[in-house]
């Protein structure tokens, strides 16, 4: 597999949201706006790339019996660094995303890539895999958030462009499920045509 294919695989064929249906908790809860979706996606991307690099580097030295707890400690370390950075430089976004930032530690996307890819491959390939999956997750959350924001409040990335208030249901839980469901259908229909 080429380096380019490693990245595009996580974007399309193994998209964590629309194909693998992973990370549903942050997907449904944080995508009330495009900015929130983008921010959560970038936070997860940061942790994915760095944890994949670290886990790939230490994997040969980690005994099989304790590899999952070790991976969780590595992931938790990067999440803690992310929390400190967000608190220092983007306190408003940190407050908005709240509990979902520390929950990246147990996000099945991050742990799944560590277990399925990073511990069996080299550092560069693991970084590219994390980048591809992270970009796929970021793109998914941003698109879901953008659609929900447009339909729910008539704005995009915080800029109001439609008159009125929009359809309130789209910024609430039912809207999250509707938008996610329709996008999953469209995405998978697109994949089957290829």
Task: List PLM regions with ranges.
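Loop-to-helix transition at the N-terminal end of transmembrane alpha-helices
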Residues: 35-52, 56-73
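Cytoplasmic-side transmembrane-helix entry/capping segments in multi-pass membrane proteins
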Residues: 62-75, 96-102, 126-129
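C-terminal transmembrane helix-loop-helix hairpin of multi-pass membrane proteins
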Residues: 5, 125-194
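Structural signature of hydrophobic alpha-helical transmembrane segments
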Residues: 34-50, 94-105, 174
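Transmembrane alpha-helix boundary signature
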Residues: 81-96
């Amino acid at each position: 597999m080429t380096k380019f294919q490693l990245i595009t695989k996580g974007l399309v064929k193994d998209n964590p949201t629309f194909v693998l249906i992973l990370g549903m908790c942050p997907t449904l809860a944080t995508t009330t706006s495009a900015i929130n979706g983008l921010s959560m996606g970038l936070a997860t991307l940061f942790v994915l790339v760095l944890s994949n690099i670290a886990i790939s580097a230490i994997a040969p030295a980690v005994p099989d019996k304790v590899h999952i707890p070790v991976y969780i400690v590595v992931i938790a370390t990067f999440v803690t660094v992310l929390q400190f950075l967000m608190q220092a430089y983007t306190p408003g976004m940190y407050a908005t995303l709240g509990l979902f930032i520390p929950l990246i530690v147990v996000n099945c996307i991050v742990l799944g890539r560590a277990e399925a890819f990073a511990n069996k491959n080299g550092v560069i390939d693991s970084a590219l895999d994390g980048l591809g999956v992270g970009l796929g997750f970021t793109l998914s959350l941003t698109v879901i958030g953008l659609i929900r924001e447009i339909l729910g409040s008539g704005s995009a990335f915080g800029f109001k462009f439609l008159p009125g208030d929009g359809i309130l249901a789209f910024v609430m839980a039912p809207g999250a499920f509707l938008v996610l469901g329709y996008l999953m259908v469209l995405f998978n229909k697109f994949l089957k045509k290829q």
